[in-house]
Amino acid sequence: MYHRNILIEQTDPEIFAAIQAENARQEHHIELIASENYASPAVMAAQGSQLTNKYAEGYPGRRYYGGCEHVDVAEQLAIDRVKQIFGADAANVQPHCGASANEAVFLAFLKPGDTIMGMSLAEGGHLTHGMALNMSGKWFNVVSYGLNDKEEIDYEAMERKAHETKPKLIIAGASAYSLAIDFERFARVAKDVGAIFMVDMAHYAGLIAAGIYPNPVPHADIVTSTTHKSLRGPRGGIILMKAQHEKIINSAIFPGLQGGPLMHVIAAKAIAFKEALSPEFKIYQQQVLKNAQIVAETLTQRGLRIVSGRTESHVMLVDLRAKGITGKEAEAVLGSAHMTINKNAIPNDPEKPMVTSGVRIGTPAMTTRGFGDEEARMTANLVADVLDNPRDAANIEAVRAKVHALTSRFPVYG
């Protein structure tokens, strides 16, 4: 028998120490990685619940195990809520991650050797959209689209390539593109060439849920997403679809790609979806967008170039070449100042992928901890202060002290 008062620190002091150190890092560092956020205590509690013990292969009301009557309730709530958020006909909440969701779509509609079209990773796409080292790039013939001279999606070139190559699947979505995507235009092209149209909205899902970024659901055959990032739920994936695709997608997830779903995570997804339906969530997302625009404007004023010239979302790419520093160096030195960021290639980047000429910045996490206009501007100036003098130890120490003063005023978990 287990006693509920047995704590991690008693069972495994080494893991406890690592968790405590990470807790401290999250509290005392400013999180600027666009794909990271802070889940609510309720979301985290669900993931630590006894639902982790339950096997539930299949779907609500159609399981291969007994004793699923209660986890059925949790999964059905998650399905109903995510459909309500995005206006979808049908939903699958079982994917373990965004990559699994994308792979399930490939399994449902494609055969090895089929042609797919996605945004080039080098110009803002995602590795699961056709990168050579990813399964999507190994199994399928990949045609990529990218940016024009204004660093905006080159819709004309995309349309021309689609008509030339007749892809079986067209993917819209990105991991490092700051502007609004014209999903309706993609849908028209896909219809013209007879392609399935899939949108990966993982980065933008929270903004879409709040109605402040274009919703792809009315236009796409299939929409995939993660449930963390801007949506602020547990780490996991979802697939939204037209009603006619529900059976084939569900079969692709189980038994095609996965076995037992993670019921504790699905319960956490349901909680996150309930949070996303609240008026407070819309206010939060509006501030995420406003903070991003303030950060972009402030960095521009401090002599840095924002790729595409602006942001219309939660994320931006920053070109560092004017400062004579690489993305790899910037990531390290900003980390020393207790601001967490990730190096990222910029369009036509002359540096290697593990070095890069840019960094990616996002505002979901800082906004979750309560940063508003003033704090967003302060954060951007602190980033610029570091990049102006990246090798000055006294400068880094001074910035770090300002970061700690700021984070102490805005704890993540009060």
UniProtKB/Swiss-Prot annotation:
Q: Which InterPro entries match?
A: PyrdxlP-dep_Trfase, PyrdxlP-dep_Trfase_major, PyrdxlP-dep_Trfase_small, Ser_HO-MeTrfase, Ser_HO-MeTrfase-like, Ser_HO-MeTrfase_PLP_BS, SHMT-like_dom
Tell me which residues are marked as the site Plays an important role in substrate specificity: 228
GO molecular function per UniProt? glycine hydroxymethyltransferase activity; pyridoxal phosphate binding
Q: Which GO terms describe its cellular component?
A: cytosol
Q: Give residues annotated as binding (6S)-5,6,7,8-tetrahydrofolate.
A: 121, 125-127
Identify the PROSITE patterns for this entry.
SHMT
Q: Which GO BP terms sit in this record?
A: glycine biosynthetic process from serine; tetrahydrofolate interconversion
Q: Where in the cell is it found?
A: Cytoplasm
Q: Which UniProt keywords apply?
A: Amino-acid biosynthesis, Cytoplasm, One-carbon metabolism, Pyridoxal phosphate, Transferase
> What Pfam families does the record point to?
SHMT (PF00464)
Q: Which cofactors, if any, are listed as required?
A: pyridoxal 5'-phosphate
Disulfide bonds listed in the record:
none
Q: Which class of enzymes does this protein belong to?
A: transferase
Query: Which pathway features in its UniProt record?
Result: One-carbon metabolism; tetrahydrofolate interconversion; Amino-acid biosynthesis; glycine biosynthesis; glycine from L-serine: step 1/1
Catalytic activities: (6R)-5,10-methylene-5,6,7,8-tetrahydrofolate + glycine + H2O = (6S)-5,6,7,8-tetrahydrofolate + L-serine
Q: Which Enzyme Commission numbers does its entry carry?
A: 2.1.2.1
Using the record, list the residue span of the signal peptide; answer none if the entry has no such feature.
none
Write down which residues bear the modification named N6-(pyridoxal phosphate)lysine.
Answer: 229
What does the protein in this record do?
Answer: Catalyzes the reversible interconversion of serine and glycine with tetrahydrofolate (THF) serving as the one-carbon carrier. This reaction serves as the major source of one-carbon groups required for the biosynthesis of purines, thymidylate, methionine, and other important biomolecules. Also exhibits THF-independent aldolase activity toward beta-hydroxyamino acids, producing glycine and aldehydes, via a retro-aldol mechanism.
Q: Which family does it belong to?
A: Belongs to the SHMT family.
Provide the assembly information: Homodimer.
Instruction: Please identify the protein, giving its name as recorded.
Output: Serine hydroxymethyltransferase
Species name:
Polaromonas naphthalenivorans (strain CJ2)
The record's gene field reads glyA
